[in-house]
Amino acid sequence: MAVDRPQNLQDTFLNFVRKNKVPLTIFLVNGVKLQGVVTWFDNFCVLLRRDGHSQLVYKHAISTIMPGAPIQMFEPGDEAGHAG
């Protein structure tokens, strides 16, 4: 029996940038800057690809994720974008 629950913002964001192949800049907690496209993610890590090379990045090491272009994941006025 499946329970229909809304996806969290983190998963919604990562899935959106993965599906749309949005280039990202990821800053780690130690200040390192990584760039690439998300090809896969789970609860603990993100697989980032750039120039034919993949990097497995643990989420606990990520400080900030910046898309390379503006993105709109929700329609204006969409209730999915509001915490409830």
From Swiss-Prot:
Tree of life domain: Bacteria
MF term (GO), any: RNA binding
Subunit and interaction comment: Homohexamer.
Family: Belongs to the Hfq family.
Pfam family membership, one: Hfq
GO process terms (BP): regulation of DNA-templated transcription; regulation of RNA stability; regulation of translation, ncRNA-mediated
Keywords attached to this entry: RNA-binding, Stress response
Gene name of the encoded protein: hfq
Name of protein: RNA-binding protein Hfq
Species whose genome carries this gene: Beijerinckia indica subsp. indica (strain ATCC 9039 / DSM 1715 / NCIMB 8712)
GO cellular component: cytosol
Lineage: Bacteria, Pseudomonadati, Pseudomonadota, Alphaproteobacteria, Hyphomicrobiales
Annotated SUPFAM superfamilies: Sm-like ribonucleoproteins
